[in-house]
Curated annotation (Swiss-Prot):
Described function: Cecropins have lytic and antibacterial activity against several Gram-negative bacteria.
Lineage: Eukaryota, Metazoa, Ecdysozoa, Arthropoda, Hexapoda
Similarity section: Belongs to the cecropin family.
Subunit structure: Monomer.
Signal peptide positions on this chain: 1-23
Organism expressing this protein natively: Glossina morsitans morsitans
Record's protein name: Cecropin
């Protein structure tokens, strides 16, 4: 029973120390994912602008 308490205590301390050290690593991955999302959004907006301009040109040509 005493061994179980010591094991849980050591596991808890180890989990806390590992989670604090990996926070930077997870933050970097989160920022990369956020950057991909921003690039996708920007590309979609530009694509919609080009499509709208093409539709305007087609409407102008048709009269």
């Amino acid at each position: 029973m005493n061994f179980y308490k010591i094991f849980v205590f050591i596991a808890l301390i180890l989990a806390l120390s590992v989670s604090q050290s990996e926070a930077g690593w997870l933050k970097k991955i989160g920022k990369k994912i956020e950057r991909v999302g921003q690039n996708t959004r920007d590309a979609t907006v530009k694509g919609l602008e080009v499509a709208q301009q093409a539709a305007n040109v087609a409407a102008t040509v048709r009269g």
